[in-house]
Amino acid sequence: MADIDGVTGSAGLQPGPSEETDEELTARFERDAIPLLDQLYGGALRMTRNPADAEDLLQETMVKAYAGFRSFRHGTNLKAWLYRILTNTYINSYRKKQRQPAEYPTEQITDWQLASNAEHSSTGLRSAEVEALEALPDTEIKEALQALPEEFRMAVYYADVEGFPYKEIAEIMDTPIGTVMSRLHRGRRQLRGLLADVARDRGFARGEQAHEGVSS
C-alpha cells in the first residue's frame, strides 16, 4: 500500500475489508471523517496562518485520507490519524512555500480554548495571572501563540486546543513522547510569559503578581 504521508504502518492502519465497495467506502468516509472538517481546518489555519493556504492544505489532506481510508482500522482514533496526515502534508508541501500570514477576522479562529482547557494535565498553565488572562480577546491569544516557535506552537495546539494526550501527539508529530513533553512544557512557559506581558500591558495583572512564575 502507498505511504499516505508517513502514516502507513502506524496505529490505526491494517488491511481493510476487501469486500467493501467504493460506494460503501465513500459512505463510511462521509460518516466518520467529514464531521471532523471544522477541527481539521482549525489545525490547518494554526499551521499556515493564512486562510487560503489552510483551505488548500485541508483539501490535500482529505484527498490523501480518502485514498488511504480503506486501510484505516475502524474503532481506532480517526482524529489522530487525520491530524497525522495533516501535519505531514504541511511539513512536506506547505511549510517551505506558504504565503505570508494575512489579516483575517477573529471569528475565523473560534477553536482557541487555552484558558479554559489549560488544566487538562498536571503541567497546565493555571495560575493567578492566567486567571486574569481569560479576559483577553482571542486575537491577543492568537498572536501570542503564533509568536512561538513552530514545534512549540503545534505541541501546545494539539494538547490544549485539541486535547490530545502525549502518546497521540507523539504519533501525530512523529517524535518521541519525551520530546513532546519537553516542547509542550517549554511552549507553555513561553506562552505564559507572552500572555502575562499582554495582560500586564492591558491592566489585567497586578504588579509583581504578573511576574510570578514567568521571570525565570
From Swiss-Prot:
Keywords: DNA-binding, Phosphoprotein, Sigma factor, Stress response, Transcription, Transcription regulation. GO terms for molecular function: DNA binding; sigma factor activity. Interacts transiently with the RNA polymerase catalytic core formed by RpoA, RpoB, RpoC and RpoZ (2 alpha, 1 beta, 1 beta' and 1 omega subunit) to form the RNA polymerase holoenzyme that can initiate transcription. Interacts (affinity=15 nM) 1:1 (via sigma-70 factor domain-4) with RshA under reducing conditions; the complex is disrupted as temperatures rise. Phosphorylation of RshA decreases its interaction with SigH, leading to increased SigH-mediated transcription. It holds the Pfam family Sigma70_r4_2. The sigma-70 factor domain-2 mediates sequence-specific interaction with the -10 element in promoter DNA, and plays an important role in melting the double-stranded DNA and the formation of the transcription bubble. The sigma-70 factor domain-2 mediates interaction with the RNA polymerase subunits RpoB and RpoC. The sigma-70 factor domain-4 contains a helix-turn-helix (H-T-H) motif that mediates interaction with the -35 element in promoter DNA. The domain also mediates interaction with the RNA polymerase subunit RpoA. Interactions between sigma-70 factor domain-4 and anti-sigma factors prevents interaction of sigma factors with the RNA polymerase catalytic core. This is ECF RNA polymerase sigma factor SigH. Disruption phenotype: Increased susceptibility to oxidative stress (H(2)O(2), cumene hydroperoxide and diamide, PubMed:12123450) and heat shock (45 and 52 degrees Celsius). Loss of stress-induced expression of a number of genes including clpB, dnaK, sigE and trxB, sigB and itself. No effect on infection of human derived macrophages, and murine J774.1 activated and unactivated macrophages. The keyword Transcription applies. Residues 37-99 are annotated as: Sigma-70 factor domain-2. Belongs to the sigma-70 factor family. ECF subfamily.
